[in-house]
Amino acid sequence: MSKEGLPTPKDVSGKGLRVAVVTATWNAEICDQLHRRALETAEAAGAIVTPLRVVGALELPVVVQAAARTHDAVVALGCVVRGGTPHFDYVCDSVTQGLTRIALDESTPVANGVLTVNDYEQAVDRAGFADSAEDKGAEAMQAALETVHTLRTLDESNLK
C-alpha cells in the first residue's frame, strides 16, 4: 500500500478542545483499533475526548450530528467491507453524504475515518495495528484537530 501523497502531520495542540469520537461496532476488531488510535492521538495532543459507540455505520450520522453541536470536532470511525450485494454502495454513500452534510450544516469539523474496503485484509492494513501500513484512526483525529485550528485562524483573521 502506498502512502504517497500523505501530508506530514502538523504539531497541533488539542489543549482545551472538546472532541467526540463516534465509532461503529460492526467489524469489532478493526473498529476497536481505529477507536483506540484516535483516542491516543487526541489524548497525546491534550484534547478532552468523549468516546461514543453506535451499532453500525448507518447510525454514525445522527450521533455525529448531536456531538457536533457540543464539541469542537467529531471523528467518525467504522468499517464497511464489500459483500456480494449493492448494500455496500448504499451504506458508504449514505454515510459519506451524511457526515459531509453535518460538517457543513454545523460548521464543525467532522473527520471521516470510516474504512470502505473490499476485504478484511485491507481493513487490517489501514487500522493502525503494529504491522498495518496505515493508521486511519490517528489520521482522522489529526485531520480533525488541524481543521479546528484552521477554522480558528479564519475566525481570528476576520476579527482584524
From Swiss-Prot:
Keywords in alphabetical order, please: Riboflavin biosynthesis, Transferase
EC number(s) reported in the record: 2.5.1.78
Its pathway, per UniProt, is:
Cofactor biosynthesis; riboflavin biosynthesis; riboflavin from 2-hydroxy-3-oxobutyl phosphate and 5-amino-6-(D-ribitylamino)uracil: step 1/2
Q: Where is the active site?
A: H87 (proton donor)
Q: What class of enzyme is it?
A: transferase
- Which GO molecular function annotation, any one, does this entry have? 6,7-dimethyl-8-ribityllumazine synthase activity
Residues recorded as binding (2S)-2-hydroxy-3-oxobutyl phosphate, renumbered to this chain, are G84, T85, R126
Enumerate the residues binding 5-amino-6-(D-ribitylamino)uracil: W26, A57, L58, E59, C79, V80, V81, N112
- One GO BP: riboflavin biosynthetic process
GO CC entries? cytosol; riboflavin synthase complex
Keyword Methyltransferase listed? The answer is no
* InterPro entries in alphabetical order: LS (IPR034964), LS/RS (IPR002180), LS/RS_sf (IPR036467)
Which reactions is this enzyme annotated as catalysing?
A: (2S)-2-hydroxy-3-oxobutyl phosphate + 5-amino-6-(D-ribitylamino)uracil = 6,7-dimethyl-8-(1-D-ribityl)lumazine + phosphate + 2 H2O + H(+)
Q: Which NCBIfam families match?
A: lumazine-synth (TIGR00114)
Q: What does this protein do?
A: Catalyzes the formation of 6,7-dimethyl-8-ribityllumazine by condensation of 5-amino-6-(D-ribitylamino)uracil with 3,4-dihydroxy-2-butanone 4-phosphate. This is the penultimate step in the biosynthesis of riboflavin.
Family recorded in the similarity comment? Belongs to the DMRL synthase family.
Task: Supply the PANTHER family for this chain.
Answer: 6,7-DIMETHYL-8-RIBITYLLUMAZINE SYNTHASE (PTHR21058:SF0), 6,7-DIMETHYL-8-RIBITYLLUMAZINE SYNTHASE DMRL SYNTHASE LUMAZINE SYNTHASE (PTHR21058)
Task: State the protein's name.
Answer: 6,7-dimethyl-8-ribityllumazine synthase
Q: Which organism is it from?
A: Corynebacterium aurimucosum (strain ATCC 700975 / DSM 44827 / CIP 107346 / CN-1)
Top-level taxonomy: Bacteria, Bacillati, Actinomycetota, Actinomycetes, Mycobacteriales
Name the encoding gene, please: ribH
